[in-house]
């Protein structure tokens, strides 16, 4: 809203969620076989399954910082996982790319003709890895600095769940629905982080993208699985 020529935005609404994913009776990491939950893990925050063997959440300030880092990395991982599989899916369905496999696409910048974004020379044509690196640092640094340091649009808002102009669809308007969405985000984000790790391992071991690896596994599960490729981790083999 506009008040006296200034832009103001609502804060993210906080309330005690009634969802099964919060509170003392929330699902635990080993279900009924879980050990005693640490006293500092009360089920107040999304994604708390009562597991902290290393005691990383014992200090409140460290816990708050780690929660912020986890959510940010979850969001990057979800975007990254989508970026790894989507071009391959499009390529397999007839869409022309210069290179659809995620870990091979960037290497085209070292080729004689450079890199055309989406295989189209009329879009961005990149020839310098240093220019790409500098642009990445500046753009991502600006966005992250704005998020951490705050700015006119984010003043007074939660760093992790700002709401306001950052929630144009109003997904956080209903506190109960918002509490559920937080849980879905952290669960899918953790899965995406593991997926990205798996994509890296696949790239090193098989030299193929995730969709091609999946197709190979479906075609011949016995010959194309983790156990069959395990010897590739042994140096010299």
Curated annotation (Swiss-Prot):
<keyword id="KW-0479">Metal-binding</keyword>
<feature type="binding site" description="axial binding residue">
    <location>
        <position position="202"/>
    </location>
    <ligand>
        <name>chlorophyll a 5</name>
    </ligand>
</feature>
<keyword id="KW-0602">Photosynthesis</keyword>
<feature type="binding site">
    <location>
        <position position="226"/>
    </location>
    <ligand>
        <name>chlorophyll a 6</name>
    </ligand>
</feature>
<protein>
    <recommendedName>
        <fullName>Chlorophyll a-b binding protein 5, chloroplastic</fullName>
    </recommendedName>
</protein>
<feature type="transmembrane region" description="Helical">
    <location>
        <begin position="123"/>
        <end position="143"/>
    </location>
</feature>
<keyword id="KW-0157">Chromophore</keyword>
<feature type="binding site">
    <location>
        <position position="136"/>
    </location>
    <ligand>
        <name>chlorophyll b 5</name>
    </ligand>
</feature>
<feature type="binding site">
    <location>
        <position position="118"/>
    </location>
    <ligand>
        <name>chlorophyll a 3</name>
    </ligand>
</feature>
<feature type="binding site">
    <location>
        <position position="190"/>
    </location>
    <ligand>
        <name>chlorophyll a 1</name>
    </ligand>
</feature>
<feature type="transmembrane region" description="Helical">
    <location>
        <begin position="191"/>
        <end position="211"/>
    </location>
</feature>
<dbReference type="InterPro" id="IPR001344">
    <property type="entry name" value="Chloro_AB-bd_pln"/>
</dbReference>
<feature type="binding site">
    <location>
        <position position="136"/>
    </location>
    <ligand>
        <name>chlorophyll b 4</name>
    </ligand>
</feature>
<keyword id="KW-0604">Photosystem II</keyword>
<feature type="binding site">
    <location>
        <position position="57"/>
    </location>
    <ligand>
        <name>chlorophyll a 1</name>
    </ligand>
</feature>
<feature type="binding site" description="axial binding residue">
    <location>
        <position position="185"/>
    </location>
    <ligand>
        <name>chlorophyll a 3</name>
    </ligand>
</feature>
<feature type="binding site">
    <location>
        <position position="108"/>
    </location>
    <ligand>
        <name>chlorophyll a 3</name>
    </ligand>
</feature>
<keyword id="KW-0597">Phosphoprotein</keyword>
<feature type="binding site" description="axial binding residue">
    <location>
        <position position="124"/>
    </location>
    <ligand>
        <name>chlorophyll b 2</name>
    </ligand>
</feature>
<keyword id="KW-1133">Transmembrane helix</keyword>
<feature type="transmembrane region" description="Helical">
    <location>
        <begin position="71"/>
        <end position="91"/>
    </location>
</feature>
<feature type="binding site" description="axial binding residue">
    <location>
        <position position="144"/>
    </location>
    <ligand>
        <name>chlorophyll b 3</name>
    </ligand>
</feature>
<feature type="binding site" description="axial binding residue">
    <location>
        <position position="73"/>
    </location>
    <ligand>
        <name>chlorophyll a 2</name>
    </ligand>
</feature>
<keyword id="KW-0150">Chloroplast</keyword>
<feature type="binding site">
    <location>
        <position position="147"/>
    </location>
    <ligand>
        <name>chlorophyll b 4</name>
    </ligand>
</feature>
<dbReference type="Pfam" id="PF00504">
    <property type="entry name" value="Chloroa_b-bind"/>
</dbReference>
<comment type="function">
    <text>The light-harvesting complex (LHC) functions as a light receptor, it captures and delivers excitation energy to photosystems with which it is closely associated.</text>
</comment>
<dbReference type="GO" id="GO:0009523">
    <property type="term" value="C:photosystem II"/>
</dbReference>
<keyword id="KW-0603">Photosystem I</keyword>
<keyword id="KW-0472">Membrane</keyword>
<keyword id="KW-0007">Acetylation</keyword>
<keyword id="KW-0934">Plastid</keyword>
<feature type="binding site" description="axial binding residue">
    <location>
        <position position="217"/>
    </location>
    <ligand>
        <name>chlorophyll a 6</name>
    </ligand>
</feature>
<keyword id="KW-0148">Chlorophyll</keyword>
<feature type="modified residue" description="Phosphothreonine">
    <location>
        <position position="12"/>
    </location>
</feature>
<feature type="binding site" description="axial binding residue">
    <location>
        <position position="188"/>
    </location>
    <ligand>
        <name>chlorophyll a 4</name>
    </ligand>
</feature>
<feature type="binding site" description="axial binding residue">
    <location>
        <position position="70"/>
    </location>
    <ligand>
        <name>chlorophyll a 1</name>
    </ligand>
</feature>
<dbReference type="GO" id="GO:0009522">
    <property type="term" value="C:photosystem I"/>
</dbReference>
<feature type="binding site">
    <location>
        <position position="153"/>
    </location>
    <ligand>
        <name>chlorophyll b 2</name>
    </ligand>
</feature>
<dbReference type="InterPro" id="IPR022796">
    <property type="entry name" value="Chloroa_b-bind"/>
</dbReference>
<feature type="binding site">
    <location>
        <position position="128"/>
    </location>
    <ligand>
        <name>chlorophyll b 3</name>
    </ligand>
</feature>
<keyword id="KW-0812">Transmembrane</keyword>
């Amino acid at each position: 809203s506009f008040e006296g020529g200034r832009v103001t935005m609502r804060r993210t609404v906080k309330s005690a969620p009634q969802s099964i994913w919060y509170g003392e009776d929330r699902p635990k990491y080993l279900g009924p076989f879980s050990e005693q939950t640490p006293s500092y893990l009360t089920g107040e925050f999304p994604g708390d399954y009562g597991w902290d063997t290393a005691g990383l959440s014992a200090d409140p300030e460290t816990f708050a910082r780690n929660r912020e880092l986890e959510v940010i990395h979850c969001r990057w991982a979800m975007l990254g996982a989508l970026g790894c599989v989507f071009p391959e899916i499009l390529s397999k369905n007839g869409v022309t790319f210069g290179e659809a496999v995620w870990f091979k696409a960037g290497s085209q910048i070292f080729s004689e003709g450079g890199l055309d974004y989406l295989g189209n020379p009329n879009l961005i044509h990149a020839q310098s890895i240093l220019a790409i690196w500098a642009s990445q640092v500046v753009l991502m640094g600006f966005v992250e600095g704005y998020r951490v340091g705050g700015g006119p649009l984010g003043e007074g808002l939660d760093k992790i769940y700002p709401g306001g102009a950052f929630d144009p669809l109003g997904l956080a308007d209903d506190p109960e629905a918002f509490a559920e969405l937080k849980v879905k985000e952290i669960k899918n984000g953790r899965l995406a982080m593991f997926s990205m790790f798996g994509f890296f391992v696949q790239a090193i071991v098989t030299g193929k993208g995730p969709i091609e690896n999946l197709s190979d596994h479906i075609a011949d599960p016995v010959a194309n699985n983790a156990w069959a490729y395990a010897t590739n981790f042994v140096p010299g083999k």
